[in-house]
Amino acid sequence: MADAAVHGHGDHHDTRGFFTRWFMS
């Protein structure tokens, strides 16, 4: 989870995409 957050780079759009991908994963 923390690793995914780091990948988001604090981007709002990226955060949403990362959440969707990690939720689907």
UniProtKB/Swiss-Prot annotation:
Q: How is the cofactor bound?
A: Binds 1 copper B ion per subunit. Binds 2 heme groups per subunit.
- GO BP annotations, alphabetical order: oxidative phosphorylation
Give Gene Ontology CC terms.
plasma membrane
Which reactions fall under this protein's catalytic activity?
4 Fe(II)-[cytochrome c] + O2 + 8 H(+)(in) = 4 Fe(III)-[cytochrome c] + 2 H2O + 4 H(+)(out)
The answer to whether the entry has keyword Nucleus is: no
Primary location? membrane
Q: What is its EC number?
A: 7.1.1.9
Cofactor(s) required for function per UniProt = Cu(2+); heme
Q: Which GO terms describe its molecular function?
A: cytochrome-c oxidase activity; metal ion binding
Which keywords describe this protein according to UniProt?
Answer: Cell inner membrane, Cell membrane, Copper, Electron transport, Heme, Hydrogen ion transport, Ion transport, Iron, Membrane, Metal-binding, Respiratory chain, Translocase, Transmembrane, Transport
Where can this protein be found? Cell inner membrane
How is this protein positioned relative to the membrane?
Multi-pass membrane protein
Q: Domain of life, per the record?
A: Bacteria
**Hey, which pathway is this one from?**
Energy metabolism; oxidative phosphorylation
Family per record: Belongs to the heme-copper respiratory oxidase family.
Described function: Subunit I and II form the functional core of the enzyme complex. Electrons originating in cytochrome c are transferred via heme a and Cu(A) to the binuclear center formed by heme a3 and Cu(B). This cytochrome c oxidase shows proton pump activity across the membrane in addition to the electron transfer.
Q: Supply the name of the protein.
A: Cytochrome c oxidase subunit 1
Q: Which organism is it from?
A: Paracoccus versutus
